[in-house]
Curated annotation (Swiss-Prot):
GO terms for molecular function: protein transmembrane transporter activity. The keyword Cell inner membrane applies. This is Sec-independent protein translocase protein TatA. PANTHER family: SEC-INDEPENDENT PROTEIN TRANSLOCASE PROTEIN TATA. The chain crosses the membrane at residues 1-21. Residues 46-67 are annotated as: Disordered. GO terms for biological process: protein transport by the Tat complex. Part of the twin-arginine translocation (Tat) system that transports large folded proteins containing a characteristic twin-arginine motif in their signal peptide across membranes. TatA could form the protein-conducting channel of the Tat system. It is a single-pass membrane protein. InterPro entries: TatA/B/E, TatA/E. Its main location: membrane. Keywords: Cell inner membrane, Cell membrane, Membrane, Protein transport, Translocation, Transmembrane, Transmembrane helix, Transport.
Length: 67
């Protein structure tokens, strides 16, 4: 798994516990889970492209010709 062994994962876990403390870990895990879920949802949904003609950046085609 990405070249990381069990020993490295344990060291990272201990460092996270020391830095954030045991009380903050559920909040961090929940936030990370929500972020991953939202990322997966965003990548699986089709892109929404606005194809309506007309205004573009607050200007109309007529304004572009005059400039």
């Amino acid at each position: 798994m990405f070249g990381i062994g069990i020993q490295e994962l344990l060291v990272v876990l201990v460092l996270v516990l020391l830095v954030f403390g045991a009380n903050k870990l559920p909040e961090i895990g929940g936030g990370l889970g929500r972020a991953i879920r939202n990322f997966k949802r965003a990548t699986s949904e089709p892109d929404e492209i606005d194809i309506t003609p007309g205004k573009k950046n607050g200007k109309t085609d007529k304004d572009d010709k005059q400039a």
